């Protein structure tokens, strides 16, 4: 009776391990995200106009605040800081990774460089994220990764595009959240 329980326990553990491996494999297979592409330039572009209360100067200051919140070294990102015309531009960077199939270790896939532009007007602002390139000896536009019929296609490209999309979605959500006016609570005692 004890031997049969041990055998059943071993089978359950083995089935659990197999299920875990299938789940892990399924998680590593990423679907190509629905990345926004500008129809004119054919480049990846995240862009939207957001209605937000405040003068252009107030929104400019909120945007600068967001840059210091989001980027580790915002002064290395800025290329244009124009408070008078309500414009901030910069060059952002993000790392991409892949998982080594043999060791299962996360490896460095490269550095993505992109342009970020925030334009501010009375009660609204517009962000634009575009010109995504893999840092290499020459420009390597990541739009190439969207072409699955390319003879050089690599399944890792889907993962890289997913990472870019996820990072840009997080960037946009933190930007829109940080641009909201701060509600000051009245100290009632």
Task: Cite the ranges covered by each PLM segment.
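Bacterial Sec-dependent N-terminal signal peptides
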Residues: 1-30
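Ser/Thr-rich, low-complexity intrinsically disordered terminal regions
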Residues: 27-189
